[in-house]
Amino acid sequence: MLEFLRKLIPWVLAGMLFGLGWHLGSDSMDAKWKQEVHNEYVKRVEAAKSTQRAIDAVSAKYQEDLAALEGSTDRIISDLRSDNKRLRVRVKTTGTSDGQCGFEPDGRAELDDRDAKRILAVTQKGDAWIRALQDTIRELQRK
């Protein structure tokens, strides 16, 4: 029995050393891969934060543009008035005249100031919205 234990002890020690090495190796590889996964996660989070900051800047610029539009429409209308230009729309004639009224040969009518202001505001808001949307798309595609 003593002879058997003498032959068995080196094998048991070799098995324990192998198991210890395996365990330490797997722990170090796990730590290495966990670190790589963590680094990749940090890179993605930083990229997402950077993209969000860029989108926030686009949004802030869009909000500033919208705030500036109110004075802009008034300025455009006053510039048109100072140049003696008018905003006009085409109108369809409704029928023949009985000869008692004036005749407008080009079939156009002048817009009311409030309507002109509203139309200009809508078009300028639409332009600002499209520019902001295009800037947002550019920032998201830069990713």
UniProtKB/Swiss-Prot annotation:
GO BP terms: proteolysis; viral release from host cell by cytolysis
Spans through the membrane: 8-24
Entry GO MF terms: peptidase activity
Topology in the lipid bilayer: Single-pass type II membrane protein
Keyword annotations of the record: Cytolysis, Host cell inner membrane, Host cell lysis by virus, Host cell membrane, Host membrane, Hydrolase, Membrane, Protease, Signal-anchor, Transmembrane, Transmembrane helix, Viral release from host cell
All ranges on the Periplasmic side of the membrane: 25-143
Quaternary structure (record): Interacts (via C-terminus) with the spanin outer lipoprotein subunit (o-spanin) (via C-terminus). Part of the spanin complex which spans the entire periplasmic space. The spanin complex is composed of spanin inner membrane subunit and spanin outer membrane subunit.
Official protein name in the record: Spanin, inner membrane subunit
